[in-house]
Amino acid sequence: MKKKRLISLLLVFALLFTAAAPTLAAAEEPARRLSVGAEDGAGSRFVSFFNAIREKLAALWNRLRTFFAVRKEKVKNTMSQNAIHMLQSVEDTICDSFIITTEDGKVIVVDGGHTAETDYFIEYLRAVTGQCVPHIDAWFLSHPHDDHVQVFLETAENRAGEVTFDKVLLNFLPYELYESRSQQEGMEMVSEFNRISKAFPEKVQILNAGDVFNIGAAKITVLYAPDESFIDVNEHSVIFRMDLGGTSVMFTGDAQVNAGNKTLAEWESTGLIDCDVCKMAHHGQNGVDRNFYEAVSPEICLWPTPTWVWDNTNGNLKTLEVRAWMEELGVKKNYKAFEGSAVIGMKPRVVTTTDVFEEGYDAATAVDRLAALGCEGIDMGFDYWVFDGSPFLSDGYLPWAQSLKARADSAGIVYTHAHAPGEVDSEYMERSIEATAAIGARYLVVHPIWRDDRGNIIRNKLRFLQINADAIKKWLPKAEEYGVVLLSENVLWGASSDPRIIAELVKKVGSDRFGWCFDVGHAWCCGYAPDVLKQCAVAPMSLHIQDNDSSGDQHLNPGDGTIDWALFTGTLREIGYLGDCVMEAHHQSLYAPDAERDAILTSLLETARSLRAEMR
């Protein structure tokens, strides 16, 4: 412990000296003159020199303090997972700062906060992405107030070597408008943005109401852009909806009653106002009116709110009234920035495997049936398409897969996963990766190699890890080329049955193109209760949900076997699981008459939604 402390102190002093060295070198000549009695301006140069040193040391100290503070928080790396991070204010003041990560590796930022929040923002971003120099794909600025835009301005102008970004999205009204109204803060922030953005005009994207576009897996719908007839700068906040995974999120900036009512008038009939998550307008007080929140009807509210606003310490705010509204509206969870930075996982999509249908089923018709039943995603079982005459085995497998994606698009459903036949060294891996991309799925689940060349079960952990790591690494370039993530699942034999070893395999491979899928039924068959996940070095990126009585791999509906489902959902809550609910309970449906299949699947999906509610 003493040795570690000494190393830390040496590191701090080395960093301090490195930061101070340029200033010392630049000041060498004035300092020399001072030492021989230079008179004119010597005193002021001396003061300037030491002020510069003090400022650099203070800045470096703040960065070091922030670095260790973020490490102490144990910020969750959610790169390539769907999640929202709401950042706390380091000064317990009003500010909006959100980082969103997507399952396809995109990073989105909404606002950022005051200049003083910049060090924390950057360190937090590094922790979230696992990148020394994080890259932001899209940075939204809601409106020109300092507590929303200063982190962007500071980062773009003075910290460009620490963070990169592709584009900044906003709709600021002209400087002249704010000047004519003597709105000082609007004038100042617009002026600063205009000055700084001259260095990157090609990165500026203007948002308008009605814009719809995607940033990777996130779909953005702009519902409101500034109406200059509204006087308050807060009313010039862009309001937009984000759909990500199975969750819809309403971002409101500091919008107030006029902006909220205009948005309702133009969009309420479309159903797009109704969202799972709502960012509270204007920090949760004096924002939009109750009717707006009623239309949003959120399950979760995000409060970028300091303690003194939450408690209405000064007695002149509407926070207590708004809090009462949200309680009356039945909000299930309130995340509050003053309680610390928070990670909000997207609502897991309810997905079912196509293995609920018999081998050789009509894949296109199955898409329509699953969409009509309210399924939110499809897991395409390529393992059920290995037979003579199968389109998956034909030369036309890619056009076939592309036709299924087109069918899913028209039905309003997505393929989220696929399942490869055999193990990771099978002859079908290449076409499985290509077909997974062709149907538009992100994840390809594949079994690990569990037998050696002689057909013997591999029981030695180290041997299992080496054989599978070598096999997986062979396919990573192909997965990268096609935008697919390979997921190994725990199966039933030898080392492959231990979820902890599968998680260790992910660490050994060390690629963002490889993760793992926890099959709760397989684990139960092999003597592992669901809480084994708490012993795994890496959290799973997906789940296979099915039940059994531990005597065999029965793929029953949850509740028809002996798995402890309360333990399962409680463990997922505890580890902060962020993936989908993939139902692999296909036994009952697979062997039922087709006329009974829809009723069976409806019941299965209802069970899945109940589990999802418990997971959150």
Give, region by region, the residue ranges found by the protein language model.
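Active-site metal-binding motif and surrounding structural segment of the metallo-beta-lactamase
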Residues: 103-108, 115-174, 266-285, 297-302
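N-terminal pre-domain/capping segments
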Residues: 348-443, 511, 538, 602-616
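Sec-dependent signal peptide cleavage junction
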Residues: 19-34
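Core dinuclear metal-dependent hydrolase active-site scaffold
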Residues: 68-71, 75-135, 206-274, 342-347
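Histidine-acidic metal/acid-base catalytic patches
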Residues: 348-351, 360-374, 437-440, 499-518, ...
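Active-site acidic/histidine proton-transfer and metal-coordination neighborhood
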Residues: 371, 402, 414, 421-518, ...
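Binuclear metal-ion centers of metallo-dependent hydrolases, dominated by the metallo-beta-lactamase
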Residues: 167, 175-234, 300, 305-347
